[in-house]
Amino acid sequence: MGHSICALIVGEPFDERAAREWDVVGLPVGQGLRLVHFSHYYTVYMQARRGETATLDVPADFPGIFPREAVVAGLAAALSGDVLSEAVAPFAVVLTDYFGGVGDQWACAFVAGRRVKAVRDINAALRVMGVQAAAGLDEFDTLGLARHRRTPDHLARYEDLCDGLGL
């Protein structure tokens, strides 16, 4: 069974109204965090729809489908209720691509609007987000992220929406 997700991880409190406005769902995963599935198509579409052009600071060697659109930071701020405040809540972006135990993962963590340069994997990103691993488990397994194996089907429509905009 594969594991292929792209997601935003944000802390609580979580703004459910903002989640509806952004067409996302925040799944509680424990330790005060929410997992928000999205996709590269989702971020490209939202970036275009909002007229944004800025990019996130993402390592150049990350795959092309790793979200680089700065709209991700806006989404994280909205979900955290930080849109009108000067505080910028930490957030992480994670991507997995595994099948049969073979594959890879990528992650970035952002604190105060800046990427934590040392973070390149999910466990490191989760540590930045404050996750304390349970005895005998890593951070990923502590939160049960293996249960979230693929991007939900409702996000597939963003591929067509991007095509419709010529993106």
Regions found by a protein language model. Give the residues of each.
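Charged interaction segments
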Residues: Q31-L33, H37-L167
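Short, extreme N-terminal segment that most often corresponds to the first beta-strand
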Residues: M1-G30
